[in-house]
């Protein structure tokens, strides 16, 4: 019987890598959930996406700008720069059309836009203007620069930092307090408020609540800095911003599409735990046909189940208090890391045929692992940084793009071992006289290749498109599809490679082992006179104790 050879330096490399990432997990501090705080200094971006949140009726958002200033370098020609905020409302997570226009397009200079409310700042005059679209009717909430009794019943009393400057603003504010948070299409659409200014730094607070069913939707808050024409890159004005955002639905700090997620994660964790328990029962029942890879496969559903449980706990605390408990968040990050690394390692090991059709990883196989494991580590690091970083920071977009690219490379890399095994079996079926067995293995490997492609397609492409296609309150269907596709992939992989004597993948021929061990045997003088003994079936002629040792 061929004895599995330790992975040596490759295994120690993996161990060091996992220790390093575990240390990184402990150093990461989770972001404050749905109670956001963002500090930007000397930023020159034209547009900053502050946040996106799905609101139900009676939900609200409070935006507290504690300091905002514009810094103009010496000799700057960007004297007529405009700054302000925009509140965009959509029915799903699709892209806002007005944000995808020309790079020099400035939304703050538009007099009227459907489904967009503008908050335009005049720092020199200590004035803020609120421009609401007249054609929106009752579809948008009213932005208010004064305390609101309805919001006070659900949150801490916001400080009064601005006063209406005209009678129209007072009438609108009174109407808002009466529960009529809508935009009258016949009213004046622009209102002005005074704001506090000290040494060129302004501070103010505004908020809104969703008072009708028609106002429900996905709201995105942006900060804009519109430069003047013909401004050179080195002469652009920069801004410094310190802002806190609190958003809440009636009974949860979670966005409308995230409210069902804690229950969903707990339910899926039970399914993964049940599938892992069934798999353990199968391994114990067919002990003679079990390999080490089978036990590695057994660890996967339990790790996935733990990750989902901790994720549900994390979301539960965010839902109830607006931010996670740091300890639970770190535990979730660690289990998420282990699950991701274990998943890709297991897929790659099955694809190479390790412990099934060969007991030694070739140099080509080891190179795949030297690529896949660091990529998977980098993908997990990117995911953790994204979860721990505010959306408006400069590095958020970089890490988000990096996560997408690295995850795509990971998915492509794990397909190579399967393709190589298919080619190897195609050549073997035509040369070694055992066409029936090799063709059965070949058919199974092709099925496994299709299975991996479908898994990647559903979890990376279909689920991603679903997130942008469904209404905002059904955004959780994206996670449901992702977790369901993962569960189906686990079950089908276990069924295809289950420990059974009639499984074509496990019907090994001694010649397959000889091909891998040929160089070792021919260079050993001690084994010069040894004869080959043909093996009838996988595990049928070996004593039970020997198989237990390799499993």
From Swiss-Prot:
InterPro entries: CAND6-7_N, GOST_TM, GPR107/GPR108-like. One of its GO terms (molecular function) is clathrin heavy chain binding. The chain crosses the membrane at residues 263-283, 293-313, 337-357, 368-388, 402-422, 450-470, 476-495. Keywords: Cell membrane, Disulfide bond, Glycoprotein, Golgi apparatus, Membrane, Phosphoprotein, Signal, Transmembrane, Transmembrane helix. It is a multi-pass membrane protein. It is found in: Cell membrane; Golgi apparatus, trans-Golgi network membrane. GO terms for biological process: clathrin-dependent endocytosis. Cleaved by FURIN to yield two fragments that remain associated via a disulfide bond. Glycans are attached at residues 64, 209. GO terms for cellular component: clathrin-coated vesicle; early endosome; Golgi apparatus; nucleoplasm; plasma membrane. Disulfide bonds join 106-226. Has been proposed to act as a receptor for neuronostatin, a peptide derived from the somatostatin/SST precursor. Involved in blood sugar regulation through the induction of glucagon in response to low glucose. Belongs to the LU7TM family. This is Protein GPR107. It comes from Mus musculus.
């Amino acid at each position: 019987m061929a004895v599995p050879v330790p992975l040596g330096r490759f295994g120690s490399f993996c161990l060091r890598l996992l220790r390093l990432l575990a240390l990184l997990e402990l150093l990461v501090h989770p972001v404050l959930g749905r109670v956001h705080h963002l500090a930007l200094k000397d930023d020159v971006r034209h547009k900053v996406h502050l946040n996106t949140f799905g609101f139900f009726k009676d939900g609200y958002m409070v935006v507290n700008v504690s300091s905002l200033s514009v810094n103009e370098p010496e000799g700057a020609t960007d004297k007529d720069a405009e700054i302000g905020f925009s509140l965009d409302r959509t029915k799903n997570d699709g892209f806002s059309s007005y944000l995808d226009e020309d790079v020099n397009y400035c939304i703050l200079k538009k007099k009227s836009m459907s489904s967009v409310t503008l908050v335009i700042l005049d720092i020199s005059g200590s004035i803020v203007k609120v421009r609401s679209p007249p054609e929106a009717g009752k579809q948008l909430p009213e932005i208010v620069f004064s305390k609101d009794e309805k919001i006070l019943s659900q949150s801490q009393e916001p400080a009064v930092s601005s006063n209406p400057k005209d009678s129209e603003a007072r009438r609108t504010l009174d109407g808002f307090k009466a529960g009529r948070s809508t935009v009258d299409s016949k009213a004046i659409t622009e209102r002005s408020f005074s704001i506090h200014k000290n040494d060129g730094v302004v501070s103010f607070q505004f908020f809104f609540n969703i008072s009708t069913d028609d106002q429900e939707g996905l709201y995105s808050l942006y900060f804009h800095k519109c430069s003047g024409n013909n401004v050179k890159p080195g002469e652009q004005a920069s801004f410094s911003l310190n802002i806190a955002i609190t958003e809440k639905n009636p009974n949860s700090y979670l966005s409308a599409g995230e409210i069902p997620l804690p229950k969903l994660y707990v339910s899926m964790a039970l399914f993964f735990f049940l599938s892992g328990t069934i798999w353990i029962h199968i391994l114990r029942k067919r002990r003679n046909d079990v390999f080490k890879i089978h036990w590695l496969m057994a660890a996967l559903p339990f790790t996935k189940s733990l990750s989902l449980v901790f994720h549900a706990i994390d979301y539960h605390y965010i839902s109830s208090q607006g931010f996670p408990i740091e300890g639970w968040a770190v535990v979730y990050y660690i289990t998420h890391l282990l699950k991701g690394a274990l998943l890709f390692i297991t897929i790659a090991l099955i694809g190479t045929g390790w412990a099934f059709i060969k007991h030694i990883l070739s140099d080509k196989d080891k190179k795949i692992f030297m690529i896949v494991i660091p990529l998977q580590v980098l993908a997990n690091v990117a995911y953790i940084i994204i979860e721990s970083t505010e959306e408006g920071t400069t590095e958020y977009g970089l890490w988000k793009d990096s996560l997408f690219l690295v995850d795509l490379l990971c998915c492509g890399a794990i397909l190579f071992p399967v393709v190589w095994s298919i080619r190897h079996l195609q050549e073997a079926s035509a040369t070694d006289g055992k066409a029936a067995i090799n063709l059965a293995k070949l058919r199974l490997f092709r099925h496994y290749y299709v299975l991996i492609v479908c898994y990647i397609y559903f979890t990376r492409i279909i689920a991603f498109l679903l997130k942008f296609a469904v209404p905002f309150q059904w955004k959780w269907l994206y996670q449901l599809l992702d977790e369901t596709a993962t569960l189906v992939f686990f079950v089908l992989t276990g069924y295809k490679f289950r420990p059974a004597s009639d499984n074509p993948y496990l019907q090994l021929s001694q010649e397959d082992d000889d091909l891998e061990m040929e160089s070792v045997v021919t260079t050993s003088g001690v084994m010069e006179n040894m004869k080959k003994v043909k093996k009838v079936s996988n595990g049928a002629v070996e004593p039970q104790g020997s198989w237990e040792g390799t499993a």
